[in-house]
Amino acid sequence: MNQEVLNIFNPVQAAPTFDQIRISLASPEKIRSWSFGEIKKPETINYRTFKPERDGLFCARIFGPTKDYECLCGKYKRMKYKGIICEKCGVEVTLARVRRERMGHIELASPVAHIWFLKSLPSRIAMMLDMPLKDIERVLYFEYYIVTEPGLTPLKQHQLLSEDDFMRAQDEYGDDSFTAEIGAEAIQNLLKAIDLDKEAERLREELAGTVSDMKQKKFSKRLKILEAFSESGNRPEWMVLTVVPVIPPELRPLVPLDGGRFATSDLNDLYRRVINRNNRLKRLIELRAPDIIIRNEKRMLQESVDALFDNGRRGRVITGANKRPLKSLADMLKGKQGRFRQNLLGKRVDYSGRSVIVVGPDLKLHECGLPKKMALELFKPFIYARLDAKGLSGTVKQSKRMVEREQPQVWDILEEVIREHPVMLNRAPTLHRLGIQAFEPKLIEGKAIQLHPLVCAAFNADFDGDQMAVHVPLSLEAQLEARVLMMSTNNILSPANGRPIIVPSQDIVLGLYYLSVAREGEPGEGKIFADLGEIEAAMDAGVVSLHAKIKSRFTEMDADGVVRRRVIDTTPGRMKIAALLPQHTAIGHRLIEKALTKKEIGNLIDVVYRHCGQKATVIFADQIMGLGFKEAAKAGISFGKDDIIIPKRKEAIVAETRTLAEEYEQQYADGLITKGEKYNKVVDAWAKATDRVADEMMAELQMKHKDENGREKEINAIYMMAHSGARGSQAQMKQLGGMRGLMAKPSGEIIETPIVSNFKEGLTVQEYFNSTHGARKGLADTALKTANSGYLTRRLVDVAQDCIIVEEDCGTTRGITLRAVVEGGDVLVSLGARVLGRFSAEDIKDPATGEIVVPADTYLTENMADLIEAAAVQSVKVRSVLTCEAKIGVCGACYGRDLARGTPVNIGEAVGVIAAQSIGEPGTQLTMRTFHIGGTAQVAEQSFFESSNDGTVRVTGATVVGTDGFLVVMSRNTAVSVLVDGKERENYKPPYGARLKIKDGDKVKRGQRLADWDPYTTPIITEVAGKIRAEDLVDGFSVREETDEATGIAQRVIADWRTSARASDLRPAMGVLAEDGSYVRLANGGEARYLMSVGAILSVGDGDMVKPGEVIARIPTEGAKTRDITGGLPRVAELFEARRPKDCAVIAEMDGRVEFGKDYKNKRRIKITPEVDADGNQGEPVEFLIPKGKHIAVHDGDFIARGEYIIDGNPDPHDILRILGVEALANFLVDEIQEVYRLQGVPINDKHIETIVRQMLQKVEILEPGDTGLIKGDHLDKPEFYVEQDRAVARGGRPATTQPVLLGITKASLQTKSFISAASFQETTRVLTEASVHGKTDTLEGLKENVIVGRLIPAGTGSYLRSLQRVAAKRDEQLAQQREDAMEPLPAVIAEEA
């Protein structure tokens, strides 16, 4: 049939296209203009005839017919009467669909305040009127009168009068001398009377004239709201409603159930309440009822409208018949079940199915097995079309019948349809983008989906009953994107870290590991073979074994690209693997001449991908998988109880440690150490013992035993599984055959008595009981952490969703400086690895020769990273998203490599979402990883440095020779570095009080200890000799004798002296006196007085003689808590939320000398006085007040550098940003977050964290507005601020000064430019209230807003379409302009002719 004819019957209206959405307050006129009629009655439908009642909530006259093209009374039916209004029932003949679009309204008999603008904090009405919210509520709910016009009476404007006061005032001043009103009318009139511009002008003047901070804040808040109203064109009185809109009836349906009952939307109940009360109020006013009754009715009307908009926001919740709170309009939007998250962001998808997954080892990497039943259902429309095209059926009905009967020709057609038509598989939870991938379906019998084993890691799938969903991309574009972007073969690398994610695991690894093992004394050792064929023949004949060390000819490509054959040392097993390697200069047999563990295989796949490309990698991965499965099956590796080896020296080690622990108990009994120190030492000793037993066990497992013929025995099967990375870990083996070790209490503390048994020996009852804590905590953690981690991911996605690559290069010269990550002498991440895939921001020079290794603006590849490593470059400045100057989004050069592709990133890549997923995805896995080790405690305390190079030591900073002849570190800026050939290779900062085992200029060997210290106490050390004088150490106030119950030994401990009023001005200290009784002078000229902090244990007494380097007191540090990601996830969240840590560090604001000033109440006063600079200027000193008893890390007279800690602890990120700037903050956040993930062995690229941090730093705070017209203390988006700044400078005004502001991810998400995105995240009511007051416009730039309004997202292929649209729009403008230009001379011509 002709398309035009069809269109008459089914008019398809083109969806209106729009580029932005604006939200604002609706005026009463606007509400009436939307409406199709006033609703006067609370009735819904006639329950006998099921027809809507006239003028009721479902009235057909107002909202439209209930059946297509049919009026209510049935006089006019069918298309031909379209548009006619029936004179009998008044219904327009049109589509029933209009009942979804047409609105009505209710004219209120008395105005009503809109609850959102009244109660949503900060209350907009209260701010407009500059009154407390409580007072406004009293007026609204008819408790008090408010004076609106005082006249000549002494009453004040906005004064509240109770009923009695009002009467009294009327008696006293006369009825007409003043006006006072009550209820919403009063508020409405007051709002009407506000002159926005005048009021704003007055506030500006007051702002300029005030110095008080409180007033400035108050004025600027009110000024903002006034400006918002005047700029958006909203009027304040519109916050009070005189007309209530009624939403279309189809959006609040009434559905008949069987049995004559109805199911209805709660909104109908709420509307009926409003209409009933409104009608009653109208009637009462007509009847001239007494004031008190009318007032009561008005108050009830106000309450019912409140409940309609936001039930429960004020007063008690209105409930329905079944005691359940009614769902109001606000509840429809809010929360997980609200409109935004349930229906707009989380739609259900057609053409999808789900089923259990089973393994498909014979599939290719790009295939999945799809059950025929499912395929038939999913591809129905395609099958119908193909049947029709082939002429096998005439109608759709016929096709349907054929498919339902499963006739033979249908199966052939299904095969045709499915060929080359990819489907998408998804496994919930989809934590990162690899949770949905496309495959080519392969029809299989049965009902389960077959999945390729190698993609399991990406989906985090296993085959213990997991289910997966299948989705069919319908349009050609969707199929194309599925094939080009989502095909499993295009997702070989992980977007989080750029390493292969298609890596063999479990059986495959075991098979390949077994193949690659070489053993001494095997049959056929030393034989030489021509090729693999000959080797296989020999193996079949039993002449040579799989692991024999043989020689064989092998063909590979030389460095110059020539294929050569040469004889190599190998084994038959390794030759089998080598046969699969692709031919390339960089890939030779040397890559597999070792035992292939999981890690090695991963590196092998990485090398193949980097050098031979994607296709070769996919083929290689598939082949290697087949080989691994086959060989693992043939090897038949299994283990029994006797394969678990208990080390011979276990008993000795345990006995030794027991003795040591008893020794510590004795020292504690003798009072040499405190209870806390004893606990720490005992725990430490057992932790070391556990490790020693484990090491012994591993050593025994690795030992190679030979039989009488000199042939090596099979390797232990458990060791093989763990060492290859197939299953199990050293930690698990330790528990099977070593000792289980220390356990943690539920609180996280470590139980002092370890579990000495292992699982093979079996646990005693007490040991079993102790071990249950850990196991139970692990399970409880899992449940809690999964939710936490999911929430973290959601916040991250929300804050970063509009971070998209928008241009190739923003042209900035800024960047950040990267260094290698070194911890305790081990390089954890090399500099080469950190800079890989970035662009250099400046020339990278060889530190020794000064030659340029890599020029600026170069994309750093693997080869360049190797060059940088070889030149021993210490630090490299690279481009980073943090310093990118693109106006919206970021540029490609600042981002660098797209980790999932291994090439520079494309325009349109949604890097923000990828960053969020990369950080959030392991969070969920980590949370689940606590209980795998059964809660065994791991103590993470570092107490020494070792050199990791041979070289020369350089010591800088203050040291003093201690009592035992070693140097003792005396200042906090002491550094120990190791030089190799004059280049600094390592740099350590030993803590205060550490003992240096070397002197400046000593030669050291690799692994030599440089320094050690007690990790459990911080000492206070004297640097001079003399006699101790105790100051202000008053027994019972600042010192208490602590007698240990267990030992009876007394120790003197500094008590908290601030608690008693008499002692509050004490300053407990230890002085060192010279012969003449005066203080000994320190090197910096200060007196040798050492202030004591609360909890310090005194090691010397009054009158004792001390030598330099002697400890005069010890401050115990907290006990060792175990660290697993439980500490980790909340730590990551704390960092991303930019919260102030509790007991945070105090950071010096500038360089200068430290002075202790006069104490203030119970605070210590520390003053930092800057040094006099070259010009003789001296800055203002800065003071800090620090609670007494906190241990201060600096001493009187020390020189301190800006950014150093005065009090140790976790620093507050806001402080770092303020004092040290953006780069220092970025480095701090990246390092801290990486440390948490590194502890769990999860690699994440730094740039993902940087991307999130960039989103947290989007805003600036105005310090001085200059001539920009901005308000001091305001927070603005950077782009908006630059626009204002440029405007002011162009006018010749003074620019504003600003400072960057760090916002936590939740705050940053809520303050995003797009109100749609913010409203769908959290606090929907607040966001929408604010947006409507400001009359905000959403320009639909991010991903989320576009999903919500149902458009293509502006990322990936969508971003390209966006750019095409922009170009087209510009062309349209130009064409229109040209047309206008061409049209201009015409009238003159016409005039001439005339």
Swiss-Prot record:
The gene is rpoC. It comes from Caulobacter sp. (strain K31). SUPFAM superfamilies: beta and beta-prime subunits of DNA dependent RNA-polymerase. Its EC number is 2.7.7.6. Keywords: DNA-directed RNA polymerase, Magnesium, Metal-binding, Nucleotidyltransferase, Transcription, Transferase, Zinc. GO terms for molecular function: DNA binding; DNA-directed RNA polymerase activity; magnesium ion binding; zinc ion binding. GO terms for biological process: DNA-templated transcription. Its cofactor is Mg(2+); Zn(2+). This is DNA-directed RNA polymerase subunit beta'. The keyword Metal-binding applies. GO terms for cellular component: DNA-directed RNA polymerase complex.
